[in-house]
Amino acid sequence: MSGSGGHGAAWLWLIPVIAYLVGGILPGEYLVRWRRGASPRELGDEPGTAGTWRQAGPAAALAVFAFDFAKGLVPVWLADRLAGGQGALLLAAAVAPVAGHNWPLQRGLRPGGRGLASAIGVTVYLAPLALVPALLAGCVVALWRRRTPWVGIVGFPLALVLMLVLRTPPARVVAAVAAMVTVGLRYLQWTRQKQRWI
């Protein structure tokens, strides 16, 4: 179903708006506070999957990953299904949940998580054949180096190469890369805060 033209399609832009707001919901904050009586940041950690694992255990971490993954996947799925993959809307729907996770309105745009799981959700929908093997390679390196960011550092560039090799439609490539760049911007901000690269 195409919704790329006309005033009747204006409501479709609610997809990225809502995606940004939902992106700002950080379940790791609530689960860690429930289990530990303090937020991840108060414990010196991040409110994502890895930080939740360290502070609240694997079950809580799995729940956090599932939620963060879904809030990335669902908006691009909706934009694709309801607007026929219209480029600008797909791009906005890809960036919005990751940006919402990274700089939540609920926190006054102060840094939230790093958006990795949400960007994975975006890219799994847009280019599954490219992302899955790239993600597996990233996970291997992350396990070897014992640092979660290596999933994205290795996985996202490799996914881009595979998208080009597999001739993924340009609108999907642009949207996926935009989500990856949004993760990268937050990671650069994180490195400045921590004064270390990884």
Task: Label every model-predicted segment.
Residues H7-R36:
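N-terminal signal-anchor transmembrane alpha helix
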Residues G28-R33, V98-P111, G138-R145, G184-K194:
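C-terminal ends of transmembrane helices
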Residues A38-P47, Q106-S118, R147-L158:
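Short, non-helical or kinked segments that cap or interrupt transmembrane helices
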Residues W53-A56, A79-D80, G115-R146, L158-R167:
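Interfacial segments of multi-pass membrane proteins
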Residues A159-I198:
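C-terminal membrane-associated helical module and adjoining short loops/tails
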